[in-house]
Amino acid sequence: MRLLSCLALVSTVAVLPAQDFDFKGVPADYAIVFATASSRGLKISDSPEAKAFKARMEKTIAGIEPSAKNSKEMQEAIKAATGMDLESPDNRIAGGVTLGAAGQLNGGVIIRARHDSKKLSAHASAKKVGTVQAGATKGWNGQELLASLSDELAKAAKDFPAPATAAGAPASEPIGVFDLDDNTLVIAQPKEAARIIDLLKGKGASYALNASLRPQVNATGRPYAVVSVNAAKLPPSAEMTNSGFQGAVFAMGENGSNQVMKLSAFFTSKEKAAPLAQQAQGMLAMAPMMLAGDPSKPQSEEDKAMMAIVGDFIAGIQPIEAKGNQVTLTTKWETLKLFGMLEKVIAIGATKAKAAPQPAAK
């Protein structure tokens, strides 16, 4: 849990319109690709309301998770070591993964964020962080670098994911952090990082969002995040072939005062798409009955409050769209109402956490 919190903190970023998603450096053969861009001016993250919401959430979470109290200290430690402001609305990421037949993942992440390369190098050297090599580019061992930034991140580094190694295969390379310039960092195993770095230098063709997917992405208003899945680049399976699944695109965007999400799945034919559309619409139709619960079983006030929040979330889900070989789920929530719903969920969780028996002190 601590590792996930810390990694989320380190990679916190938001996004720009779809035409400004920067995929340069992302290998075109990745099965799953994602990107974000600057959040500057977005109500969801770069507004007085968003900042006030974030402050309230940090205070609430700190009351139930002691390690959360150190988030500001971690941010300051990272800024002192790298010059990077994790809360800058101009931070962006792009990357992706490919999956092997045995289920092993390979991929990388490009972080586009202003930082001080000299300061980062001096810090890594002073902390004696191990080095790795991606072609002609030197980098640092990612786990060791993370551990060197702060005591809390050092604890998280113990849970750092180790690259999987197939039985009988040579030991896998560690994940490295490669600093290309004051605006670009690459996180990947050395061999993959070398490939990404070459693409960033213009040596080869990077991934490009398919033109057929742009209407779905742009339909969210001002898109600020996108994830694309290409089934043809996933390991083949009889189940996937029979389903006719070709791929999917997920996008989040801001349209006026609303947050809009679209998730579209594509199939080889209208007939192959129909089962998913029917199942999804059926689940939505059953939602009110599921929320009503069993009248013979009394609900606590907390449970009633949570069901009301879930009802508000579901109310933002639009009817399933089935058009030809495409099935689309659209959600729309008013931004301030969304903040309120999330705040209520956290508050209920905090109340339950405080009421739960505490582990005995050792």
Per-region residue spans from a language model:
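A conserved glycine-rich beta-strand in the N-terminal activation segment of trypsin-fold
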Residues: 167-242
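Helix-loop elements that line ligand-binding/catalytic pockets
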Residues: 244-273
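Sec-dependent N-terminal signal peptides
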Residues: 3-14
